[in-house]
Amino acid sequence: MSLLTEVETYVLSIVPSGPLKAEIAQRLEDVFAGKNTDLEALMEWLKTRPILSPLTKGILGFVFTLTVPSERGLQRRRFVQNALNGNGDPNNMDRAVKLYKKLKREITFHGAKEVALSYSTGALASCMGLIYNRMGTVTTEVAFGLVCATCEQIADSQHRSHRQMATTTNPLIRHENRMVLASTTAKAMEQMAGSSEQAAEAMEVASQARQMVQAMRTIGTHPSSSAGLKDNLLENLQAYQKRMGVQMQRFK
């Protein structure tokens, strides 16, 4: 799973199901693909979204700011700063500073995520706030590790389940990951289709998959309902590849 796919999975796992979730998923995909480069418009859109908690908006704002290239002098947004202040608790700020010092020594996404998972959500949010306010700098990869650790903690508390250190067992995250991977596979099928005889068939399968993912995000479904979605898509893709005589290992 690529880094950006993983970030998208974790961030979407804390967004409530509904039409807005499908819309946010599309914005994240566009931002990660470099298609949306107007950070100011994106932040204004995010600020006015209903339903989302201030912390979720803060995390999304942080992710957009990390990803979208912007002018150096661009003003930081108050709604993100307020969400990432650790509820104004000085203990959270103290822990955030300690965590920040540890993150400075990390160079990988997974290393940063593992270090961050031992801190409370308040401390993690405060640490994001430090980085967002330019009071500290870490690599984008490390910052994404911090984001995913925060989302995992929020998803865990939402599901009232205990975190496993080695692997993510949280069904909300697994469910979202299946849908993100299904979307990614659908995109691959569309790219492969080209002008071949089977192009129409491939486009149809990809289109159905996109609609299914969008419907699942909009209506909200039980985490187990997406279990077969990715497998069906991968089977379709492999059957299509076989007929085309194409091998694309990364989608297997």
Curated annotation (Swiss-Prot):
Keyword terms, alphabetized: Host nucleus, Membrane, RNA-binding, Viral matrix protein, Virion
Pfam families (UniProt xref): Flu_M1 (PF00598), Flu_M1_C (PF08289)
Location of region: RNP-binding: 165-252
Location relative to the cell: Virion membrane; Host nucleus
Intrachain S-S bonds: none
Membrane topology note: Peripheral membrane protein
Residue ranges of the region described as Membrane-binding: 1-164
GO biological process, one term: viral budding from plasma membrane
GO cellular component: host cell nucleus; membrane; virion membrane
Motif stretch (Nuclear localization signal): 101-105
GO MF annotation terms: RNA binding; structural constituent of virion
Biological function: Plays critical roles in virus replication, from virus entry and uncoating to assembly and budding of the virus particle. M1 binding to ribonucleocapsids (RNPs) in nucleus seems to inhibit viral transcription. Interaction of viral NEP with M1-RNP is thought to promote nuclear export of the complex, which is targeted to the virion assembly site at the apical plasma membrane in polarized epithelial cells. Interactions with NA and HA may bring M1, a non-raft-associated protein, into lipid rafts. Forms a continuous shell on the inner side of the lipid bilayer in virion, where it binds the RNP. Determines the virion's shape: spherical or filamentous. Clinical isolates of influenza are characterized by the presence of significant proportion of filamentous virions, whereas after multiple passage on eggs or cell culture, virions have only spherical morphology. Filamentous virions are thought to be important to infect neighboring cells, and spherical virions more suited to spread through aerosol between hosts organisms.
Other comment: Most abundant protein in virion. When expressed alone can form virus-like particles in transfected cells.
Sequence similarity: Belongs to the influenza viruses Matrix protein M1 family.
UniProt subunit comment: Homodimer and homomultimer. Interacts with NEP. Binds ribonucleocapsid by both interacting with genomic RNA and NP protein. May interact with HA and NA. Cannot bind NP without genomic RNA.
Protein name, UniProt field: Matrix protein 1
Native organism taxonomy: Viruses, Riboviria, Orthornavirae, Negarnaviricota, Polyploviricotina
